[in-house]
């Protein structure tokens, strides 16, 4: 009987979460042409005032990581490709659809001053983001596994931290139901973490993930800070002020931290599934 309930919940949680997001999509009106292009910058760097800015934000961080992926003899990221590539593209497809939808309804958008060209309604750099950014974080994930295999602190706190985050994500969604970005992102993050916490017993990677998420905040703050206008006349990524929490860390909406948690946790979870399957 208990096993039947477990199987039932295993399917109910993702289905219920998807239904919640679809219900929100159908019932919530998003005000169009309401994107905020004026964000107080902390400083101004004239080099960033170029249509290639978003491209440069991919190129300069990713080239060294791509190089180390093939030539670092200890990390050897290329040996994980059979598990990494399916994880990257499966989750990228989900987020491409999500990103395109949010752009089309006016939850966020992209400033044409800072990207090269579009495919559909997304800049080419945005399409690439869902591959290059998780790949870069995976490089850190793998490097920490190799060079710092003992992860005592995060492994010790991962269960209470996971439970606290699950409650926090769903609470944020509940109390901000009228904000599309906040509500749907928090539902997604809470649901994927809850599902993994309850049912994925074979690949308990949460401690290692929390560690790399903490380390990854440094490059995230740099790149996302630039994308959200910390050093430019206008942001690269512009948001509808009625659809997010309205709280920013410098220029970065707090919702972005939840969004990136959902993206990176999902990629890592699927990567660990494929790695476990191939082993």
Task: Set out the residue ranges of the language-model regions.
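Aromatic-rich, lipid-facing transmembrane alpha helices and their immediate juxtamembrane interface loops
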Residues: 2-279
């Amino acid at each position: 009987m208990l096993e039947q309930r477990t199987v039932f919940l295993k399917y109910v949680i993702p289905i219920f979460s998807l239904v919640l997001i679809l219900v929100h999509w159908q019932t919530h009106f998003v005000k169009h042409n309401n994107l905020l292009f004026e964000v107080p910058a902390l400083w101004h760097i004239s080099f960033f005032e170029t249509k290639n800015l978003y491209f440069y934000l991919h190129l300069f961080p990713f080239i060294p990581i791509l190089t180390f992926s093939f030539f670092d003899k200890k990390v050897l990221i290329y040996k994980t490709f059979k598990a990494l590539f399916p994880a990257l593209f499966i989750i990228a497809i989900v987020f491409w659809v999500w990103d395109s939808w949010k752009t089309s309804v006016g939850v966020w958008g992209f400033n044409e001053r800072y990207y090269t060209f579009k495919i559909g309604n997304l800049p080419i750099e945005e399409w690439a983001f869902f591959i290059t950014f998780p790949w870069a974080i995976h490089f850190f994930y793998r490097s920490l596994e190799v060079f710092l295999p003992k992860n005592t602190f995060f492994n010790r706190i991962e269960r209470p931290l996971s439970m606290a985050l699950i409650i926090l994500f769903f609470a944020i969604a509940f109390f901000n139901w009228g904000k599309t970005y906040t509500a749907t992102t928090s539902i997604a993050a809470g649901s994927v973490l809850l599902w993994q916490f309850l049912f994925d017993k074979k690949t308990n990677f949460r401690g290692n993930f929390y560690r790399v998420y903490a380390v990854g905040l440094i490059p995230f703050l740099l790149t996302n800070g630039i994308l959200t206008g910390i050093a430019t006349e206008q942001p690269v990524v512009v948001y509808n002020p009625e659809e997010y929490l309205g709280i920013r860390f410098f220029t970065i909406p707090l919702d972005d931290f939840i969004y990136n948690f959902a993206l990176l946790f999902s990629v890592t979870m699927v990567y660990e599934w494929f790695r476990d399957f191939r082993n």
